[in-house]
Amino acid sequence: MDCALAEKYKNLTHEKEICKKLSLSYYSIQIKYKNLFESENCEKECYRFIEQHFNCGKKMTAISDILGTNEDIKTLSESIRSVHMVSLYLLGYSLYQCFEDDLNKYFMQYIGKSDRGEEYDFRYTWFLTALFHDITSCKEVITKHNEIEGKQSIENVIKSEKNIYDYKLQSGKKFIPKFPKDFVLRYLKEREEKDRVDHGIVAGYNFFNSMCTIFEQKLGEEEIIVEKTDKERMLMWDKTYMDHFVFIADAIISHNIWFDEKTEKMVGKWAYEENPLNFILCLLDTIEPIKRFCEDKRSTLKYNEVLENISVIKDDERKIKISWNDVIRNCELEKWERWKDNIKKLDEWMKIDVEEGSDFLILRW
């Protein structure tokens, strides 16, 4: 088998990183594999890892606005979803060379360079996307216990003044989302009728509202502010970053919308060239294995065992090879088949080619 995810997660480096002897995330946050995936409290360690990124960037309000109570935080920090989000982030980080240049070119069409001429860093976009996309999964099911809160979160979306659908980019161009506003709100209401809060839509709306509010309060009338933090690190607040946030919010909002229950048809095939960040999130969210193999207490495999027995590597330009060994198949046959089938069916709703071998899948787009 090619390099296992466990080995990749332990040895992640980035070409823009000054220190390459440590596995570092954005803000030079250390990626401590054993803590995240082998400790007794993996879920809490992963939640701390998520918090650390938003705290370091002084964006923690985005999480506290949506996880309004200690009970919410407790639920998420004890949930597999926190581990899934971290694994998804590290999976994307390990494959950044597949996407970074394409995303940079795409964003340059709409956002351009900041006044300081800083180069684009995939890790910034990706940590905000991956570590937030399932943040409201702890509130997804509407019950008698949380009915008022669940319906209020939906109402907040509907009444939100700051939203991606009314947003104009700094260039003056109007932002064009993956799905129109009416369709998204209809989809949200249809989910509510089934006692579900679509966690992607609610998270994406809240992300955009919170991030824009944070930056507006910090910047005031200024275009750019460079702030020195407690750890002698420089933190930049740039108005053009709000353009960045609208693309991230759109990816989060749309990442669960692939089937229209009203028409009982797929919503159309997603194209990499048209919405690359949305495409990447849905692609890797489907591939990320922890969510599938460890989703219930009956799972026989631990988090690290899943990552040690699955490989996901860049095989060529716009080509990923996913392979596994017999441990995965023999221990969790039913979950392995479901995970593999979900990946194989990506070509039903994404413009992607899937090739199957005896112990691997190859994806081309």
Roles of regions detected by a PLM:
Residues 1-65, 284-287, 293-365:
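C-terminal effector/catalytic modules and regulatory tails appended to multi-domain proteins
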Residues 52, 65, 90, 205, ...:
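Charged/polar, solvent-exposed surface patches and flexible loops
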Residues 11, 35, 41, 55, ...:
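Detector for Asparagine
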Residues 2-178:
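Acidic/His-rich, divalent-metal-binding segments that scaffold phosphate/diphosphate chemistry
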Residues 82-85, 197, 242, 277, ...:
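Generic detection of long, well-ordered alpha-helical segments
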Residues 97-100, 208, 212-215, 344:
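A general structural signal for alpha-helical elements within enzymatic catalytic domains
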Residues 119-304:
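Divalent metal-dependent catalytic cores for phosphoryl transfer on phosphate-bearing substrates
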